[in-house]
């Protein structure tokens, strides 16, 4: 519920309510996915999360039913995955994807956030992966190309993404320096965008752009592994240009999630970053999504279930209903 505050102007005033009416506004969709196990806490987490996802499925996929009730690219990107398994309503994914991108010409990043632009590109490939709907990929492909033209126009002389005027370098609500130079997490998302562009180009038999974006992904991946890796610390630093060699989880999670480094380095990341309590923990459910996805991909299922119990289970314990 949203809340209304009624202020009485008279000191001794009194108001009596005859009735309060609530309007429950939601899409009438069938659940195609379900979950049940012997762990009742996990069952409650699933049920609460599924209900939350359903509430956020309006004309578009909202970021939250309480606030902001807005279409944010990163939140939508995650919600697409949930939808494929929970409702499998492809229309809402297509509507949200088109709304996020907006009309031509592209003059700013999606929601002004570069990471959200990269997710927008990746989300289209993942939509095809889950649905096989090539017609939609074909329909938005011209916008994908113009989006990447915009992205390329804002890279630095080394073809790295660096913050430009009007950009909000978000990544996560986390305390690390995101404005000093070309941060690693953004480069890794750009690699993912290049890779997904190459895959979509291949679907449409656009050999020239398949080769172009595939080569760009490979070149940037090599550059990131060369410049951002710190062997002594066993992880990728946030920004190699500042000299402080600080490490946070975000870029290292992307390295695991998108398979952007060697198996040897992945093992070091798990030991020296992910399981290192001295590294600033992830504090938002938004980025926990990526962390737990990465942990599942590399088989760290105990880590995943422990986090579900402590983080989302903690919300349930405090009385959360969404």
Residue spans for each PLM region:
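Structured loops at beta-to-helix junctions and adjacent beta-edge loops in soluble globular domains
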Residues: 7-9, 23-25, 56, 82, ...
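Short amphipathic alpha-helical segments with coiled-coil-like heptad repeat character
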Residues: 12-13, 57-60, 198, 263-264
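Short helix/loop capping segments that flank catalytic or ligand/cofactor-binding pockets
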Residues: 15-16, 45, 61, 139
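Glycine- and acidic
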Residues: 30-37, 60-65, 78, 105-107, ...
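Active-site core of glycosidic bond-cleaving carbohydrate-active enzymes
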Residues: 72-322
């Amino acid at each position: 519920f949203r809340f209304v505050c009624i202020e009485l102007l008279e000191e001794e005033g009194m108001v009596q309510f005859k009735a309060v009416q609530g309007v429950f506004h939601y899409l009438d969709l069938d659940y195609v996915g379900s979950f049940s196990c012997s762990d009742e806490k996990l069952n409650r987490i699933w049920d609460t999360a599924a209900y939350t996802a359903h509430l956020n499925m309006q004309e578009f996929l909202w970021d939250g039913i309480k606030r902001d009730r807005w279409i944010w690219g990163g939140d939508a990107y995650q919600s697409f995955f949930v939808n494929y398994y929970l409702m499998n309503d492809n229309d809402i994914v297509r509507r949200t994807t088109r709304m996020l991108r907006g009309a031509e010409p592209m003059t700013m990043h999606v929601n002004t956030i570069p990471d959200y632009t990269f997710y927008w590109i990746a989300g289209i490939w993942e939509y095809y992966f889950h649905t096989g709907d090539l017609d939609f990929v074909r329909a938005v492909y011209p916008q994908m190309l113009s989006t990447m033209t915009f992205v390329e126009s804002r890279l630095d002389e080394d073809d790295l993404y660096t913050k430009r005027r009007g950009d909000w370098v978000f990544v996560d609500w986390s305390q690390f320096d995101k404005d000093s130079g070309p941060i690693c997490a953004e480069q890794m998302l750009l690699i993912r965008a290049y890779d997904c562009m190459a895959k979509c180009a291949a679907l449409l038999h656009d050999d020239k752009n398949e080769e172009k974006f595939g080569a760009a992904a490979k070149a940037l991946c090599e550059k990131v592994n060369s410049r951002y890796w710190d062997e002594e610390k066993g992880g990728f630093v946030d920004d190699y240009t500042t000299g402080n060699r600080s490490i946070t989880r975000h870029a290292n999670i992307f390295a695991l999630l998108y398979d952007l480094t060697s198996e040897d380095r992945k093992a070091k990341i798990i030991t020296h970053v992910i399981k290192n309590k001295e590294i600033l923990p992830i504090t938002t459910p938004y980025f926990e999504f990526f962390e737990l996805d990465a942990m599942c991909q590399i088989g760290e299922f105990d880590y995943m279930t422990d986090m579900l119990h402590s983080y989302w289970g903690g919300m349930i314990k405090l009385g959360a209903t969404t």
